[in-house]
Swiss-Prot record:
<dbReference type="InterPro" id="IPR036635">
    <property type="entry name" value="MurB_C_sf"/>
</dbReference>
<feature type="active site" description="Proton donor">
    <location>
        <position position="226"/>
    </location>
</feature>
<keyword id="KW-0521">NADP</keyword>
<comment type="similarity">
    <text>Belongs to the MurB family.</text>
</comment>
<keyword id="KW-0560">Oxidoreductase</keyword>
<dbReference type="InterPro" id="IPR016166">
    <property type="entry name" value="FAD-bd_PCMH"/>
</dbReference>
<dbReference type="GO" id="GO:0071949">
    <property type="term" value="F:FAD binding"/>
</dbReference>
<dbReference type="GO" id="GO:0051301">
    <property type="term" value="P:cell division"/>
</dbReference>
<dbReference type="InterPro" id="IPR016169">
    <property type="entry name" value="FAD-bd_PCMH_sub2"/>
</dbReference>
<dbReference type="InterPro" id="IPR006094">
    <property type="entry name" value="Oxid_FAD_bind_N"/>
</dbReference>
<keyword id="KW-0133">Cell shape</keyword>
<dbReference type="GO" id="GO:0071555">
    <property type="term" value="P:cell wall organization"/>
</dbReference>
<dbReference type="InterPro" id="IPR016167">
    <property type="entry name" value="FAD-bd_PCMH_sub1"/>
</dbReference>
<dbReference type="GO" id="GO:0005829">
    <property type="term" value="C:cytosol"/>
</dbReference>
<keyword id="KW-0963">Cytoplasm</keyword>
<keyword id="KW-0573">Peptidoglycan synthesis</keyword>
<comment type="pathway">
    <text>Cell wall biogenesis; peptidoglycan biosynthesis.</text>
</comment>
Length: 304
């Protein structure tokens, strides 16, 4: 429970209207589910962000970062402490062959701005629904490309609010992983090194990838995207389909009938429904094929 004294202290460094109390997280996730955040902060500047990070550290408050909630399931019990939203930190700029994007910017928008400047390297991201921050954390990728291929560096805060610049090597980018899985950095922006390209060829590739996404993915329902990582030598969606799980349902959550790698919220699903279906899929695939599917989606928060 947040005390009046804690709130008063927060208001010294962040606008009062940017502090939401007991905010429903279902309003901030692609799956449209999740419990309440004790405090939901929406800073508009790096200064406000650094203040909030330092405040959480100095007052021993749990701190959770949130982009646009596209690859996330928040449990029905919600999140204690502070949830720090980057929804207002969305600036994107271009300097020569480099594109600089704030953490809350949509990576789809970054790919479009790169195209506008005839810069190649971010075409793969034209259908990824996440933010720059989320894309860096998980080394997001699609259709043969990934963040690792073009990310130059990142500007971050430590939990004490100190500003650092992290090089490509220090980011430790691997398949759906990075240094952020073990180091508690708060990402402010990413800097991408791109190359000059033919606008017609860039557009052709982006149009092709967008068409593939729209025809193969269940975009008509809320979801967190691809639920599982690709097991070596296999495709998660194919294993799920071959296990007879396409259309399987728990509560309002269903294994998509359009693409078995997705679990969709077809009717007022709770996070408990969604997570239970993830577990059911894992158990069934392991029993049938001896392969344990590892979730790509991040599951956070407390049980109801």
């Amino acid at each position: 429970m947040m005390t009046e004294q804690l709130l008063a202290g927060l208001y010294e460094g962040i606008a009062k209207e940017a502090v939401l109390i007991n905010e429903p997280l279902k309003n901030h996730t692609y799956t449209k589910m999740g419990g309440l955040a004790d405090l939901f902060l929406i800073p508009s500047t790096y200064e406000e962000t650094a203040f909030a990070v330092r405040y959480a550290y100095e007052h021993d408050l749990p701190l959770t970062m949130l982009g646009n909630g596209s690859n996330l399931v928040v449990r029905d019990g919600g999140i204690r402490g502070i949830v720090l939203s980057f929804e207002k930190l969305t600036d994107i700029s271009v300097e020569g062959h480099e594109l600089i994007a704030q953490s809350g910017a949509a990576i789809i928008q970054a790919s479009r701005i790169a195209y506008d400047h005839a810069l190649s390297g971010l075409e793969f991201a034209c259908g990824i629904p996440g933010t720059i921050g989320g894309a860096l954390i998980m080394n997001a990728g699609a259709y043969g490309g990934e963040v690792k291929d073009c990310l130059h560096s990142a500007t971050v805060l430590t939990r004490k609010g100190e500003l650092l610049n992290i090089s490509h090597e220090e980011l430790e980018l691997g398949y759906r992983t990075s240094c952020f899985s073990k180091k508690e950095y708060i990402i402010l922006e990413g800097r991408f090194s791109l190359t000059e390209g033919d606008p017609a060829l860039i557009k052709e590739m982006m149009d092709d990838l967008t068409h593939k996404r729209e025809t193969k993915q269940p975009l008509e329902y809320p979801s967190c995207g691809s639920v599982f990582k690709r097991p070596e030598g296999y495709f998660a969606g194919k294993l799920i389909q071959d296990s007879g799980l396409q259309g399987a349902r728990i509560g309002g959550a269903e294994v998509s009938q359009k693409h078995a790698g997705f679990i969709v919220n077809i009717k007022d699903a709770t996070a408990t429904d969604y997570i239970s279906l993830i577990r059911h899929v894992q158990e069934t695939v392991q029993e049938k094929f001896g392969i344990l599917l590892e979730p790509e989606v991040k599951i956070i928060g407390e049980e109801a």
